[in-house]
UniProtKB/Swiss-Prot annotation:
Name of the gene: lsrF
SUPFAM superfamilies: Aldolase (SSF51569)
Family the entry assigns: Belongs to the DeoC/FbaB aldolase family.
NCBIfam families, per the entry: PRK08227.1 (NF006081)
A Pfam short name: DeoC
Catalytic residues, chain numbering: 168
Function: Involved in the degradation of phospho-AI-2, thereby terminating induction of the lsr operon and closing the AI-2 signaling cycle. Catalyzes the transfer of an acetyl moiety from 3-hydroxy-5-phosphonooxypentane-2,4-dione to CoA to form glycerone phosphate and acetyl-CoA.
PANTHER family per the UniProt record, alphabetical: 3-HYDROXY-5-PHOSPHONOOXYPENTANE-2,4-DIONE THIOLASE, FRUCTOSE-BISPHOSPHATE ALDOLASE CLASS 1
Protein name, as recorded: 3-hydroxy-5-phosphonooxypentane-2,4-dione thiolase
Localization, UniProt: Cytoplasm
Amino acid sequence: MQSRLSWIFNPKTGKTVMLAFDHGYFQGPTTGLERIDINIAPLFEHADVLMCTRGILRSVVPPATNKPGVLRASGANSILAELSNEAVALSMDDAVRLNSCAVAAQVYIGSEYEHQSIKNIIQLVDAGMKVGMPTMAVTGVGKDMVRDQRYFSLATRIAAEMGAQIIKTYYVEKGFERIVAGCPVPIVIAGGKKLPERETLEMCWQAIDQGASGVDMGRNIFQSDHPVAMMKAVQAVVHHNETADRAYELYLSEKQ
């Protein structure tokens, strides 16, 4: 378990920059992910960890990439139906076979299928403990849920109490440090919808400054006009404690 966690978090900084491109498991070929081999592959070398589905790992990611992978382990839903209605979509045997560093599943606190999503986390944690595989719980938000400190404090703590070793959640401007303080395992933030680059870097800096252990971003990287430059700027914030202003200057210089 600790060995795999060390693949995720840089031993010098204790933090991580994950590149998430697992969106296709329920969104299909969304903008920026139509051709992963063309649009996403050039970013692999600039990420600490790749987050994807086993189908993409096997079909698109070259074995020589040599990057740790967090595998999407929940699914069986789509944007055409209720998003929270997920099942476990990956066996632990296959996760081990693919040499992944963790598995990830959504947890939908307060949604119609809350109970099933929590059971999915429990199932993965139990199976993972037998083989030393960490589970990352991803806090999905129902359509009618308010994205605030109280909600994410509840969701992250429940996931940690169920045994998840890492939590992926959203940054909130008010009270994020309370979310981190109330969660006994590392938190990495999701990027969410595409933002202007300067705003994304400010969000990264604020999250790290308030205790996050890293970021797990997708659209704010691969939908950027200059994704490699954006990856380098995010790395500067997470691992080198650069401010958002300095990281944005780096982004501007790298995009030339």
